Amino acid sequence: MENVITKQIIVNKKKTYWKNVEQIDKKSALIKDIENKEFANQLPVDKILLDQEGLEADNTTRRDFLKYVGFSTTAAALAACEGPVIKSVPYVVQPEQIRPGIANYYATAIADGFDFASILVKTREGRPIKIESNNDASDFCSANARVHASVLSLYDTKRIQTPKVRGQDSSWDELKSEVLLDLNAVSKKQGKVVLLTQTFASPTTNKIIKDLVTKFPNIEHIILDTVPSSYAVESFKDAYGFEGLVDYDFSKSDFIVSVDADFLGDWQGGGYDTKYVSNRVPDRKNRKGRMSKHVQFESNMTLTGANADIRVPATPTEQKKILSYIYSEVKGLNSKIKLSPEQKENAKFAADGIKKFGSKAVIVSGLDDKNVQDLILDLNNHIRSLAIENSARLTRTQSGNEVDVFIKELLDGKISGLITVGLNPVYSLSEGEKIKKAISDLDFSLSFSMKEDETSSVCKYIAAAPHYLESWGDYEFKEGQYFLAQPTIRPLFNTMQFQDFVLSVIGSSKDYYATIKAFWKQNVLNGRSWNKVLHDGFYKKSKKEKLKFNPKK
């Protein structure tokens, strides 16, 4: 028996592996049962690819199921591997600005209605990761905490990723054709369409909007600033002849009086903090310090009030009385205004300080009242305050009661169409629910928005707007001071800027970038290099004429 086994091993040189002892006996019933259950049938590829019902009805074993999954996964992976063919030529010497791991910085600007600043964007491998102040621009160069955090909204997954028509994803061509049909239909009915925007402070955008209104005369452009300074703008217009705001240089003032003006916060677009702190440097040891005196009258605690030397709590009504008392004292008028002993003492201190420091003093107010703003302008002109800059600030241009008139007409059904750009009036205005219902009843409504907010969600059309770090732009925050915004990354989603869309609607052959470049070469640069200004992010033109204070009687 041993000889037989030995011969068999010698003859069968091919190795045989057994999974269990039962496989030694080829006649075993257990072996036949195992062979029927394991790899018994061929993989039904036709059923996988073509017959879904047959696949579901098939009695599939666990191992066959794993085959199906493996096949489908492999097929999907192979299909995804088919990418576009990109022809590239390698660099002989690799440029420093595209070396992996080394960050690049680009100058751009932000103007979202709240913050206005020239900034530097740090990018790594083509992705913006951090915001810095552009210190080369002496004005509007401060990036506050909100500006620093704005890079996060670029990567927000809740952004609208494509245009929408009646709540459904669409294309830009379809959106454009639908919008043109509705605009023409409303025009034939002589219906009124309101274009509601923030203050753009952009000369090129303002020109594009004028071209749109020329093509569609039934469109009325109304400016809505979420943090308004409407009566300050109106007072400035009455005093200086055009819409704008007084710009203050607090570094030139040794005595500052503020009546509810949070100039270290959002007041008039911010940006006052750098020059304010430059005149508040205590250095008694070397006697080189400069410390201005700051008196703050306000109702709520603000960042400005927290930094004041003297902070006096007062209601808005009391603030108006305090301001009237200061005005009368400085001008030498008889004042019969009644104040509490504490308020009168501090108001007298403020008035005496203004008289003592004269042109080295300044008074500002954030009260949205026409009479208050008239008093402020007249008082600063009376003392010839050096803090009044020669150029007007253009970050707020909403004036008067045009927004109130718009709301009334919208609720009364006198408006046929509405276009909003970067605004959420349903959320920010007081009669939000009524406005929401009125917008949903309009024949035509279009919202340019990054998110499907309270306003855009009830609009007929939603135009997916890009992030400011994906956009081109130009701004004039202050007379003669121009700033450029450039994209620091390719658009992450299927978005389009408001300006590009309007240019396509009015039939322009140029895109927004080409329009900005042409406008600047013709009206701004005066022969300067476009690339140099784009690199720096700003350009300043000297202004020869001074602001002339000539108030209406």
Residue locations for each model-derived region?
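Intrinsic low-complexity, intrinsically disordered segments enriched in polar/basic residues
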Residues: 9-15, 374-377, 381, 540-548, ...
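A generic alpha-helix preference that emphasizes hydrophobic side chains
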Residues: 27-28, 62, 141, 192, ...
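Long, low-complexity segments enriched in small/aliphatic residues
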Residues: 520-553
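N-terminal export/assembly segments and adjacent metallocofactor-ligating motifs
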Residues: 1-337, 341-342
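Non-catalytic alpha/beta scaffold blocks inside enzyme catalytic domains
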Residues: 186, 224-530
